[in-house]
A protein has these predicted regions:
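Residue-level signature of transmembrane alpha-helical entry/exit and packing/kink sites
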Residues: 30, 66-70, 74, 119-120, ...
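Long, highly hydrophobic alpha-helical transmembrane signal-anchor segments
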Residues: 42-67, 119-154, 232-236
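Interfacial aromatic "cap" segments that immediately flank transmembrane helices
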Residues: 3-4, 8-9, 13-43, 103-133, ...
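Transmembrane-helix bundle segments that line or gate the permeation/cavity pathway
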Residues: 37-38, 44-53, 77, 81-88
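Generic hydrophobic, aliphatic-rich segments that mediate packing or membrane embedding
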Residues: 71, 75, 84-91, 105, ...
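Juxtamembrane transition segments at transmembrane-helix termini in multipass membrane proteins
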Residues: 2-6, 18, 55-67, 80-101, ...
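Short, surface-exposed helix-loop/turn micro-motifs enriched in polar/charged residues
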Residues: 101-102, 148
């Protein structure tokens, strides 16, 4: 039986701890489905990239073919990012609707994700012009203000980045998951973030540090393995070297994508916490109907 409470306002500590509680409970089912749904697309991108590296000399002067390959990689990568972001949202949504379930099937997840994709794509396109361009302008302004004060610039940029992670993920959840129009969703998110803002921002900051640490390990360990293998045995074959690089990059990227789920789920907990009163009212209403 699913005894995890989704609709609950959480403070800083509970947001962090309950994120790990959720993954301790559902990790096996969650990540098996995650790899099943996203793995094929991820491997396809890796294989195309590996072949590009191996046979680069063959088509390096063929610009139309080169541009086509880059375009295909770009489209596949965009869809991979969308699937990665939508997956935990879809998984949680299915558990919300079926409180007694302890596992979800990949087919169900794919159906929900497929329905989310059009709004997710539209959200990305609109936000690029409405949110991201002004954000990049803000970063340039900060760079001009702080000038050569590199440390202050890095602190200000990092703080702005954490705020942006919190804001954009909450914005996407309201727009994609709740189905509000763009600007009503924007107003709702701004209003919601005013409540317990520092709890939400602090939890986002700490989770980002945790993810960065695991991601760094996922990148550094393959690099150490690469240099160790090259130093001890060496690989003369271009194909062998390419396969080695591909395998190590695949390992590192897989770690990065997997740990990103912790941040996304934390944002889902923040989002669902705003619905606690609404959900409680629904339960009370059902209870009244039963009594009648």
């Amino acid at each position: 039986m699913n005894d995890f409470v989704f609709y609950k306002k959480r403070d800083f500590g509970m947001l962090i701890s309950d994120t790990f509680v959720f993954f301790r409970k559902y990790a096996k089912n969650f990540f098996s489905n995650y790899l099943l749904i996203n793995g094929a697309l991820f491997i396809l991108i890796g294989v195309i990239a590996a072949f590009m590296f191996i046979f680069y000399d063959v088509y390096s002067n063929n610009w139309p073919l080169l541009l086509l390959i880059f375009a295909v990689l770009g489209v596949l990568s965009a869809f991979l990012v969308l699937f990665v972001i939508c997956f935990p949202i879809a998984y949680t949504q299915l558990l919300e609707k079926n409180a007694d379930r302890s596992s979800i099937k990949a087919k169900e997840l794919f159906v929900v994700i497929r329905k989310m994709l059009p709004r997710a794509i539209l959200f990305g396109i609109i936000s690029f012009f409405i949110i991201l361009i002004p954000y990049f302008i803000l970063i340039l302004v900060l760079a001009r203000i702080f000038g050569h004060q590199i440390i202050l610039m890095q602190i200000a940029s990092y703080f702005a980045g954490i705020v942006m992670i919190l804001f954009m993920q909450q914005f996407m959840l309201v727009y994609v998951k709740d189905g509000l129009d763009y600007f009503p969703a924007l107003r709702k998110v701004i209003q919601e973030l005013k409540e317990r803002f520092w709890d939400k921002l602090g939890a986002t900051f700490v989770m980002n540090l945790i993810i960065t640490a695991f991601s760094a390990a996922g990148i550094v360990v393959p690099l150490v393995l690469y240099f160790t293998i090259m130093l001890l045995i060496g690989i003369d074959s271009l194909i062998g070297l390419s396969l080695l690089i591909f395998t190590l990059v695949l390992i590192g990227a897989t770690v990065v994508f997997i740990v990103s789920n912790f941040q996304i789920f934390l944002q889902i907990l923040i989002h669902l916490g705003e619905k606690e009163e609404e959900h409680t009212d629904d339960i009370d209403l059902i209870g009244k109907h039963v009594e009648e």
